[in-house]
């Protein structure tokens, strides 16, 4: 998945940012050097950190569920990251609106953080390879989370079903010979997915709350078209995600969501 753009398909996110636009105009004076964070985002961050600190100790899945739940209702916003092959990358913290991938970024960084400074530092490790805030080292694809070292997640897709399918991709390549993201190379990668019609009760039982589900892309230049989190909710499994169609972060019944996509790629966070 390239970071989110809506023109490639009718899903909420497609994971590619072809253009990157600035977020809100007002940037906090308290922001650390090199960090772009609005006053509203700074306030949201402090509130979230306080809520997490007050939450009872929980296992990894419950911790992920709690943190991801803090974003429910947050407005959807595309193109919040800043940087391209021709524009310097900025370390953006935008918690007042999120797309499918920035939502995942912020949840993962919050899971690792007890303070504002820790969050800002951990977000660099989540979003960028080698801790280098640059367009070239941004993790543009969903499967970068498992393919980059140190890995943020393990790709568990193949172990979920005997019907899992492996396919060879050339990430970032277009059918016309161009690339989705100018200035970045084409990345050969094997992507494994479970076709939606094969995601039965047995497969769902092997998913864990906090797993990230990517909607498999038929396009050979993309790995997935949308990303969200699996939650084993009391009323049934849901897909928690930032939806452009609904305009906010929502829970969608997993069975309903599976009916709209070709298959799932599943990454299990290492923490």
Which residue stretches match the model-derived regions?
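A mid-sequence, solvent-exposed acidic-amphipathic segment
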Residues: 170-217
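Short, contiguous, pocket-lining structural segments
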Residues: 92-96, 205, 219
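C-terminal soluble interaction/assembly domains
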Residues: 213-270
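Short, well-structured alpha-helical interface segments that form or flank functional binding sites
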Residues: 99, 208, 223
């Amino acid at each position: 998945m390239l970071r989110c753009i809506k023109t490639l398909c009718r899903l909420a996110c497609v994971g590619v940012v072809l253009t990157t636009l600035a977020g809100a105009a007002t940037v906090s004076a308290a922001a650390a050097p090199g960090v772009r964070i609005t006053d509203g985002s700074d306030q949201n961050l402090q509130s979230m950190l306080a809520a997490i600190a007050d939450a009872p100790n929980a296992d990894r899945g419950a911790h992920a569920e709690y943190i991801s739940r803090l974003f429910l209702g947050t407005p959807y916003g595309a193109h919040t990251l800043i940087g391209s092959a021709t524009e310097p990358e900025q370390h953006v913290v935008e918690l007042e609106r999120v797309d499918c991938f920035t939502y995942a970024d912020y949840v993962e960084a919050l899971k690792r953080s007890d303070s504002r400074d820790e969050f800002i530092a951990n977000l660099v490790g989540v979003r960028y390879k080698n801790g280098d805030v640059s367009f070239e080292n941004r993790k543009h694809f969903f499967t970068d989370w498992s393919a980059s070292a140190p890995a943020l997640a393990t790709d568990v897709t193949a172990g979920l079903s005997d019907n899992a399918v492996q396919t060879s991709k050339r990430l970032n390549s277009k059918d016309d010979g161009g690339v989705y993201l100018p200035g970045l190379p084409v990345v050969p990668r094997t992507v494994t997915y479970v076709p939606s019609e094969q995601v039965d009760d047995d497969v769902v039982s092997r998913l864990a709350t906090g797993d990230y589900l990517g909607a498999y892309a038929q396009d050979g230049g993309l790995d997935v078209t949308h990303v969200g989190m699996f939650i084993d909710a009391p009323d049934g499994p849901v897909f928690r995600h930032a939806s452009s169609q609904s305009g906010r972060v929502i829970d969608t019944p997993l069975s309903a969501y599976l009916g709209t996509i070709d298959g799932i790629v599943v990454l299990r966070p290492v923490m």
